[in-house]
């Protein structure tokens, strides 16, 4: 029996593990183990089938949840003859059709009662690694002091934490690296919080956080250089024209033009250069109740189907 595996960046990063077993009927049952704490979009493409009946669902293109996901089965034409199949795979963080609430009210990610001057960062005109482009690039900069606390603006599950770099603590605003926390929301959008002081994260991947919960400390040097909160919310958007992968990635990030709650102003989009005061009113903090849906959690066992 000959079985071959094609090119796959899944194995190098170990975020998604694809495996298959042969069942009692001789079928090859494929599954994917998602080690992340949010949904991923998985695509599997087969280039070779020898003595294998192609499954009508192929190429496989679907969301996989955290934990174990059963995918599909391949059946040999003649169980007594060798089989061969070659496939490639790719994945993207997020949902195929993200049900994002672009009118959601976010807290300012700073201490209640604290005042800050807000700026919109300019678009760097380049996409993040693995993306074809970014739409509506929108990142807020909040002037802070070193050691100030960063708070979660919305309920969600921590998906990534990076706080190992010390460049920003030496006063570098754009050091090429950025300490940050990423949090997944119930509508499959993601919040990015930076720039954290080295080793200052107060949360870890997989942790459920509530609105207004401390998640890290602001970096920067003793003179305040590099001391700012960079806050953005984005979600996955698929490009059907590029979905085959023949001309590049078929996914890109769309940024949400945030509606934030501030004291004396209420809900609204923040103006570049204006000064605002943070406030955590209960109505905003509790707008996502338990009954309205839970953020995605990683399962310890069982299967997602």
Where are these regions (language model features)?
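Short beta-strand elements of extracellular/lumenal beta-sandwich folds
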Residues: 17-37
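Short acidic, flexible loop segments centered on an aromatic residue
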Residues: 24, 35-54
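Surface-exposed, glycine-biased beta-strand/turn segments
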Residues: 61-177, 275-305
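A structural signal for short beta-strand/turn segments enriched in small hydrophobics and glycine
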Residues: 150, 156-158, 206-218
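Flexible, gly/ser-rich surface segments that form the specificity/activation loops bordering the active-site cleft
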Residues: 160-176, 213-230
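Short histidine-centered loop motifs in beta-beta connectors
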Residues: 189-212
């Amino acid at each position: 029996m000959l079985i071959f595996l094609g090119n796959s960046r899944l194995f190098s990063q170990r975020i998604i593990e694809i495996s298959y077993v042969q069942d009692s009927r001789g079928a090859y049952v494929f599954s994917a183990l998602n080690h992340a704490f949010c949904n991923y979009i998985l695509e599997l493409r087969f280039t070779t089938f020898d003595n294998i009946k192609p499954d009508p669902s192929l190429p496989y293109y679907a969301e996989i949840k955290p934990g174990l996901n059963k995918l599909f089965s391949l059946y040999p034409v003649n169980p007594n003859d060798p089989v061969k199949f070659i496939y490639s795979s790719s994945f993207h963080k997020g949902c195929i059709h993200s049900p994002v609430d672009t009118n959601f009210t976010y807290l300012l990610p700073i201490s209640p009662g604290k005042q800050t001057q807000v700026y919109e960062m300019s678009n760097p005109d380049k996409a993040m690694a693995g993306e074809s482009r970014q739409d509506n690039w929108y990142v807020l900069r909040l002037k802070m002091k070193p050691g100030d606390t960063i708070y979660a603006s919305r309920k969600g599950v921590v998906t990534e934490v990076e706080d190992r770099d010390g460049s920003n603590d030496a006063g570098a605003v754009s050091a090429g690296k950025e300490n940050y926390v990423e949090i997944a929301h119930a509508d499959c959008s993601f919040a990015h919080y930076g720039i954290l002081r080295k080793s200052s994260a107060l949360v870890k991947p997989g942790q459920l956080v509530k609105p207004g919960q401390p998640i890290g400390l602001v970096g920067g040097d003793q003179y305040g250089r590099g001391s700012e909160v960079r806050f953005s919310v984005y979600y996955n958007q698929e490009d059907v024209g590029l979905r085959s992968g023949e001309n590049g990635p078929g996914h890109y990030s769309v940024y949400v033009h945030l509606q934030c709650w501030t004291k004396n102003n209420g809900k609204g989009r923040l103006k570049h250069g204006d000064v605002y005061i943070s406030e955590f009113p209960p109505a905003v903090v509790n707008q996502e109740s338990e009954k309205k849906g839970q953020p995605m959690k990683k399962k310890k066992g069982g299967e997602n189907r």
